[in-house]
Amino acid sequence: MSCPYPFKVFSCTVSRHSHQAACVVAKTQATSQPRGALSPGGGFLAALALSVTGWRIGSKGHIVAQKTSTPPPDTIQAGDMITDFDQYLLGEGTHRQLWRVLGAHVQDDATHFAVWAPNARAVSVTGDFNGWSGTEMTAVGQTGVWQVRIPGVGDGALYKYQITDANGALREKADPVGFGAQHPPEQASVVRDIRGYGWRDGAWMETRAEAADRAAPISIYEVHLGSWRRKWDDGGRPLSYKEAAQDLVGYVRHMGFTHIELMPISEFPFDGSWGYQPVGLYAPTIRFGPPHEFRDLVDAAHAAGLGVLLDWVPGHFPTDEHGLATFDGTHLYEHADPKEGFHQDWNTLIFNYGRTEVRNYLVANALYWMEEYHLDGLRVDAVASMLYRDYSRDEGQWVPNKDGGRENLEAISFLQEMNVAVYGADASVMTVAEESTSFPGVSQPVHTGGLGFGYKWNMGWMNDTLSYMALDPIHRQHHHSQMTNPIMWQYSENFILPISHDEVVHGKGSMLEKMPGNDWEKLANLRAYYGYMWMHPGKKLIFMGCEFAQPGEWSHDGDLNWDAASRPAHAGVQALVRDLNHLYRDTPALHVKDCMPDGFAWICNDPAQSTLGFARFGAAGDAPVVVMCNFTPVERVAFRMGVPTPGEWDEVLNTDAAAYGGGNRGNLGGVLSEPTPCDGHAQSVTLTLPPLSTVVLRLKD
């Protein structure tokens, strides 16, 4: 007989009918328990408790618990957290809330420890609570997980796992799912009670979907917390999370940005990696404070109307002995073959995305940051290195996929799974891919074959336009297409225009140093470029310091040159970026159709004069915007350009304004169109284009 009443196991609907099942398990809010035995016909009888050692999927896809003739050893102590259903999910590698089971969990009078080490001969917990002598852990069924509950251990305790591998060798490891860690170079994990934080961001959480929408203005301030500002009167230390909650949040709000993007804060041993070589994916770095203070930072940002994105690194991990490498004596998280598992550029190890438990470890980590820390999105690092098996490898140094190709099919599948899980859990967040190739469909839905990201960095736009701006203006006429061609692929993805930390390090120079000419021309070039960038379709991202034209490259060992920011020329660029943000946010035509081709139209392009003009459009009834850029140091007087609509056009921004450090040449606040055909339009306006400038006009209401 069939049963018409299915029940839910997470997002999968499972029928109560299976002829092969000895027991079917349902997930409840409190625990997971057998619902009842099945009659020979498949119907439910009274509830019957069974000893469960394993799980399988029945022939029709039903979740089945298998009964054994003898009960398993009593390996689970009273008060342990791992339920039968947890065991099933752990065994299958599909536990989306992995952090609620593994790691160190503070209870009333004890701490429960659990770690996945399936190939270990034995595992112990060693810490400052047992004289670092080791407390034996017990295996949990067939899951590969070991656990123990230790009375008297609480928040702040130091611990490591002592893992005896199959050959009898002893390894000391930090907790892969630890919520805290010692300050590097110390390597122990730290018990952190992350329960019960008093969030005050309910209003933000209810409406944040609007801030992530493709039609919303998104302007992101990328930050390296350790070097944004330092306390030089206190030994040169970086700001704490709590101090950043006041100083950083206040500054970003004042500057008109919509989001803060934090470079990686998952615990990492080497400062020089900037966080891109993490060992503690579940632990906010202690460099700036404990976990609850990181929550204070996020809570403060939300109170200020700012979203918080985290730079997330699922592509690789370092070889540090206390980390994930050969965790239980085997290549547990990484590939055994270095042609698949070793990243030659960074001397790091690559996750084995073909292993279900490893995928689950990473997917659960993405969900963890959203759920436990209320983050509003993830920027996924180095996606290109994940997508291709031959990435940065010579011939013969990589292993083809099962079809003989170069694509990393397992990584592609993992990224799709991650995006489906993240958006499935909370559609109000965003995921962003740093992807530098032409891999198709990065920000397209998974069900259409895409990777499922919300947005993708437009690395091509960044490379082309910065290359153009570095040229002496006399040569720009021969490279005009570098400023115009990017629009040809602008709508193939949901793009963010990025000026990131990678562009101001390793000898590339600061944004100001990239610009040609004398000091005045450098600043004018940069102002014109920022005007072009903010008016161009696509969401915006800029790295800290670039907003005030920091004179030199960024260094993680110091902080930003705030002295320069106080000088008039640099303060002018800072004021420009603030005004660009507010204009972008307040003008629907500049953001509503960032990702739609009918929101943009070319008006004029003159390579010989290095000028270009375009229009931006919003929804019906939104005032259109016209943008004109002059990338030569020559003033253009009585410059005529077509406009899409007759009427009075306000000059809402001019990068040559005196307030920004310019020469204050312009159009006296606005122009009136004339019935003189130009550039294919029946109406046109006559403009003064200052040298090295961007002028923005908006149709007067």
UniProtKB/Swiss-Prot annotation:
Recorded hits in Pfam families, A to Z, give: Alpha-amylase (PF00128), Alpha-amylase_C (PF02806), CBM_48 (PF02922)
What keywords were assigned to this record?
Carbohydrate metabolism, Glycogen biosynthesis, Glycogen metabolism, Glycosyltransferase, Transferase
- GO MF terms held by the record: 1,4-alpha-glucan branching enzyme activity; cation binding; hydrolase activity, hydrolyzing O-glycosyl compounds
The reaction(s) annotated as catalysed by this protein in its Swiss-Prot or TrEMBL entry are: Transfers a segment of a (1->4)-alpha-D-glucan chain to a primary hydroxy group in a similar glucan chain
User: Which InterPro entries does the entry mention?
Assistant: A-amylase/branching_C, Branching_enzy, GlgB, GlgB_N_E_set_prok, Glyco_hydro_13_cat_dom, Glyco_hydro_13_N, Glyco_hydro_b, Glycoside_hydrolase_SF
Q: Name one GO cellular component term.
A: cytosol
| Enzyme's top EC category | transferase
Q: Where is the active site?
A: D381, E434
Q: What does this protein do?
A: Catalyzes the formation of the alpha-1,6-glucosidic linkages in glycogen by scission of a 1,4-alpha-linked oligosaccharide from growing alpha-1,4-glucan chains and the subsequent attachment of the oligosaccharide to the alpha-1,6 position.
The record's comment on protein family reads: Belongs to the glycosyl hydrolase 13 family. GlgB subfamily.
Subunit record text: Monomer.
Q: What is this protein called?
A: 1,4-alpha-glucan branching enzyme GlgB
